[in-house]
Regions:
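N-terminal amphipathic/basic helix or basic patch
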Residues: 4-12
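Membrane-embedded catalytic scaffold of the fatty acid hydroxylase/desaturase
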Residues: 11-164, 171
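Hydrophobic alpha-helical transmembrane segments
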Residues: 1-5, 89-90
Length: 171
């Protein structure tokens, strides 16, 4: 059963590392496979106050959302060999991957929901520093690495928005 909290922490660390070093690191180069994140997704979210209409379309064609879903699927498959020896860990990682896509999609279709439930992600897209707030589902690893930067967003004029993530329900 220790695999569940370890899997959740590992997945949150993975969000941080992948977002910071792959999506923003490699993704800033237009020639990179990962450029969709910076050049499509971030542009849309900034221009439309967090909304990325591409999430309203079905997962078809070759676009930012299908690339994101494919990367999550490949990541899930990479953990498959661990299933016989660490089923709770793998289950928690797979849950985290599915939850990541669910909340990330919802955040970019419903900005008011994002402000209430993922203020750190709103800060990532609409705040002054897009090179902070790397976590999407929970700000745990951002807090550990001191990359959680609270800023004003278009939805809330002041206050601490995200220092107590456990107090915010996801549903």
């Amino acid at each position: 059963m220790i695999g569940i909290p370890l899997g959740l922490l590992y997945a949150n660390a993975g969000e941080w590392v992948i977002h910071k070093y792959i999506l923003h690191g490699l993704g800033r180069r237009k020639s990179s496979f990962w450029s969709f994140h910076w050049h499509e997704h971030h542009r849309a979210a900034r221009q439309h106050q967090m909304v990325d209409d591409a999430y309203a379309r079905p997962l078809s064609g070759w676009n930012a959302q299908t690339k994101e879903a494919l990367a999550l699927g490949v990541g899930a498959l990479c953990h498959l060999p661990l299933l016989p020896v660490a089923p709770f860990f793998v289950g928690a990682v797979w849950f985290s991957m599915a939850n990541y896509y669910r909340v990330h999609r919802k955040a970019h279709l419903d900005p008011a929901w994002a402000e209430a439930h993922l203020p750190w992600h709103v800060d990532h897209h609409l705040g002054r520093n897009p090179d902070a707030n790397w976590c999407v589902t929970r700000p745990w690893f951002d807090q550990l690495m001191r990359t959680r930067v609270t800023t004003r967003s278009a939805f809330k004029s002041s206050g601490d928005r995200g220092s107590s993530p456990s107090a915010r329900p996801l549903a």
